Amino acid sequence: MSEVYEGAIGIDLGTTYSCVAVWETANVEIIPNDQGARTTPSFVAFTETERLVGDAAKNQAAMNPRNTVFDAKRLIGRRYEDPETQKDIKHWPFKVIDNNGIPTIEVNYLGEKKQFTAQEISAMVLTKMKEISEAKLNKRVEKAVITVPAYFSDSQRAATKDAGAIAGLNVLRIINEPTAAAIAYGLDAKSDKPKNVLIFDLGGGTFDVSLLKIQGGVFEVLATAGDTHLGGEDFDNALVEHFIQEFKRKQKIDISDDPRALRRLRSACERAKRALSSVTQTTVEVDSLSNGIDFSSSITRARFEDINATTFKATIDPVAKVLKDSKVPKADVHDIVLVGGSTRIPKVQRLVSDFFDGRALNKSINPDEAVAYGAAVQAAVLTNKADSDKTQDLLLLDVVPLSLGVAMEGNVFGVVCPRNTPIPTIKKRTFTTVADNQTTVTFPVYQGERVNCAENEPLGEFQLTGIPPMPRGQAELEATFELDANGILKVTAVEKTTGRSAHIEITNSVGHLSSTKIQEMIENADKFKQQDKDFAKKLEAKSQLESYISNIETTISEPNVMMKLKRGDKSKIEAQLAECMSQLELEDTNTDALRKAELRLKRTVQKAFASLR
């Protein structure tokens, strides 16, 4: 397709599932994938012959656990030694190695060991979402708005933007998931009176709570809180651990080091978790779980709630935090909107309702699609495709999720930009030298809420040199923190007497890639895409040849043909059939060889049958 789509798509890049939407004819359309599903598993699988993305990857996960990658969102922009990363590695069947502090996924693909970053895996999922939209629009898609959890750090946001670039997308904006969901909620319910709306977004792997003031088309985030490492996957993990222990107790077999058994048990636990949102008891069944032993166990909703009690309760702390940060009393929250598949869990709904003194919760928007919906609206606004009264005054005012600053003497965190500051923004703070005649100052940049920098996240550092020698404390060094609409940071420092300056765009933090590295990954992605196309063509040629062989074998076996066909001609056809079968059995055969074999067989058949006329 040569025609380029003028607008942009909205993508909800989820931990477990992703969703894509587009603004068309004054409305948002959620685009189904080739299976007809409106959400696509965020899974990528590698085999000896091909790469699979989405449903096809998830469906074969139990047979190929070590080479089926999921949860890339839990790795993106994180360091290998991060405690959360280490915790996750214990649950994943695929291998994650330390590559200079960057967690890197190692798989077997096309008979070789290959290594991929979380950005590259995410880019493969984004490419799939891009292709889904292109199939619908019949145009090439080049622009997108991608959503991230509100509590994502600068590194995680930048890494997500890089993933978009690797997928061949111009990422117009990174927007926060709860803000996108608020658009889905508020677009059709505009009011001139201000409304305080709490978005409770509990997905497959991340959790956000945002409080917004919505008035007309203005969506102003007052405060945000959450946990980038809490969601449905954690509830699955707890169930899996529960049943591992039960199987061990009953059968004296430990399956914790058996990736295939774990994948099958995880799938059964995920189904049970979903079922328990609508029934009070269900059964977890896995045929031949280990050593030919079938596993079957019933679980009640009450037991499921008990197993996850601590995790469920942890979802309420961020709710209290946003109300405290925004100084908005419970009673002044007009609506509590549930977003994310995990909000279907009755216990979660009860906890939220109880916190708000038994208030009814708003379930008016589709929890799986709301975020992509809001992203599509923002995409339409940014590309001037939003041609509706509903969107003409739309304005998003988001906030910084975590404080930003620099390390001062004693490794104390000097906050420059406090959390919940509206973005885009520019914040300044003056620092000074700590030693006499100091001519160089290093500015280590951090993000977090702790006093000790060691307990916050390092984003990068830069040096300001050429400071005139003077007694300690006399130099005036002004640090400027500039945050763009994506929440991505640029820091500048100026020595006021000389005007000498230095700056850093946070690009050397873990997760953010250099432009050279991104280009290299784009080329790799194109190479994999070509390999996928080549494999599909080979499969088609193989299938076509097999079908033709079958037809010819049937034809020459028919009595009336056998009687008329010359013995020599039949022998030639049989020889060609044998040659074609040999070609099909070759491991390293290619599309060209298969097509040539089919052509030779066709010519032999045509010559033989010409003599029958």
From Swiss-Prot:
<feature type="modified residue" description="Phosphoserine">
    <location>
        <position position="501"/>
    </location>
</feature>
<feature type="modified residue" description="Phosphoserine">
    <location>
        <position position="153"/>
    </location>
</feature>
<dbReference type="GO" id="GO:0031072">
    <property type="term" value="F:heat shock protein binding"/>
</dbReference>
<feature type="region of interest" description="Substrate binding domain (SBD)">
    <location>
        <begin position="402"/>
        <end position="612"/>
    </location>
</feature>
<feature type="region of interest" description="Nucleotide binding domain (NBD)">
    <location>
        <begin position="1"/>
        <end position="390"/>
    </location>
</feature>
<feature type="binding site">
    <location>
        <begin position="204"/>
        <end position="206"/>
    </location>
    <ligand>
        <name>ATP</name>
    </ligand>
</feature>
<dbReference type="GO" id="GO:0005634">
    <property type="term" value="C:nucleus"/>
</dbReference>
<dbReference type="GO" id="GO:0016887">
    <property type="term" value="F:ATP hydrolysis activity"/>
</dbReference>
<dbReference type="GO" id="GO:0051082">
    <property type="term" value="F:unfolded protein binding"/>
</dbReference>
<dbReference type="InterPro" id="IPR029047">
    <property type="entry name" value="HSP70_peptide-bd_sf"/>
</dbReference>
<dbReference type="GO" id="GO:0044183">
    <property type="term" value="F:protein folding chaperone"/>
</dbReference>
<dbReference type="GO" id="GO:0140662">
    <property type="term" value="F:ATP-dependent protein folding chaperone"/>
</dbReference>
<dbReference type="GO" id="GO:0042026">
    <property type="term" value="P:protein refolding"/>
</dbReference>
<keyword id="KW-0143">Chaperone</keyword>
<dbReference type="GO" id="GO:0042254">
    <property type="term" value="P:ribosome biogenesis"/>
</dbReference>
<feature type="modified residue" description="Phosphothreonine">
    <location>
        <position position="516"/>
    </location>
</feature>
<feature type="modified residue" description="Phosphothreonine">
    <location>
        <position position="40"/>
    </location>
</feature>
<feature type="binding site">
    <location>
        <position position="73"/>
    </location>
    <ligand>
        <name>ATP</name>
    </ligand>
</feature>
<feature type="binding site">
    <location>
        <begin position="270"/>
        <end position="277"/>
    </location>
    <ligand>
        <name>ATP</name>
    </ligand>
</feature>
<comment type="subunit">
    <text>Binds to ribosomes. Binds close to the ribosomal tunnel exit via contacts with both ribosomal proteins and rRNA. Directly interacts with nascent polypeptides. This interaction is dependent on the ribosome-associated complex (RAC). Interacts with pss1. Interacts with fes1.</text>
</comment>
<dbReference type="GO" id="GO:0005829">
    <property type="term" value="C:cytosol"/>
</dbReference>
<keyword id="KW-0597">Phosphoprotein</keyword>
<feature type="modified residue" description="Phosphoserine">
    <location>
        <position position="515"/>
    </location>
</feature>
<dbReference type="Pfam" id="PF00012">
    <property type="entry name" value="HSP70"/>
</dbReference>
<comment type="function">
    <text>Ribosome-bound, Hsp70-type chaperone that assists in the cotranslational folding of newly synthesized proteins in the cytosol. Stimulates folding by interacting with nascent chains, binding to short, largely hydrophobic sequences exposed by unfolded proteins, thereby stabilizing longer, more slowly translated, and aggregation-prone nascent polypeptides and domains that cannot fold stably until fully synthesized. The Hsp70-protein substrate interaction depends on ATP-binding and on allosteric regulation between the NBD and the SBD.</text>
</comment>
<feature type="modified residue" description="Phosphoserine">
    <location>
        <position position="155"/>
    </location>
</feature>
<keyword id="KW-0547">Nucleotide-binding</keyword>
<feature type="modified residue" description="Phosphoserine">
    <location>
        <position position="514"/>
    </location>
</feature>
<dbReference type="GO" id="GO:0006412">
    <property type="term" value="P:translation"/>
</dbReference>
<dbReference type="InterPro" id="IPR029048">
    <property type="entry name" value="HSP70_C_sf"/>
</dbReference>
<keyword id="KW-0067">ATP-binding</keyword>
<feature type="modified residue" description="Phosphotyrosine">
    <location>
        <position position="151"/>
    </location>
</feature>
<feature type="binding site">
    <location>
        <begin position="15"/>
        <end position="17"/>
    </location>
    <ligand>
        <name>ATP</name>
    </ligand>
</feature>
<keyword id="KW-0378">Hydrolase</keyword>
<protein>
    <recommendedName>
        <fullName>Ribosome-associated molecular chaperone sks2</fullName>
        <ecNumber>3.6.4.10</ecNumber>
    </recommendedName>
</protein>
<feature type="region of interest" description="Lid domain (SBDalpha)">
    <location>
        <begin position="515"/>
        <end position="611"/>
    </location>
</feature>
<dbReference type="InterPro" id="IPR043129">
    <property type="entry name" value="ATPase_NBD"/>
</dbReference>
<dbReference type="GO" id="GO:0005524">
    <property type="term" value="F:ATP binding"/>
</dbReference>
<dbReference type="GO" id="GO:0051085">
    <property type="term" value="P:chaperone cofactor-dependent protein refolding"/>
</dbReference>
<dbReference type="GO" id="GO:0005886">
    <property type="term" value="C:plasma membrane"/>
</dbReference>
<dbReference type="InterPro" id="IPR013126">
    <property type="entry name" value="Hsp_70_fam"/>
</dbReference>
<dbReference type="GO" id="GO:0005737">
    <property type="term" value="C:cytoplasm"/>
</dbReference>
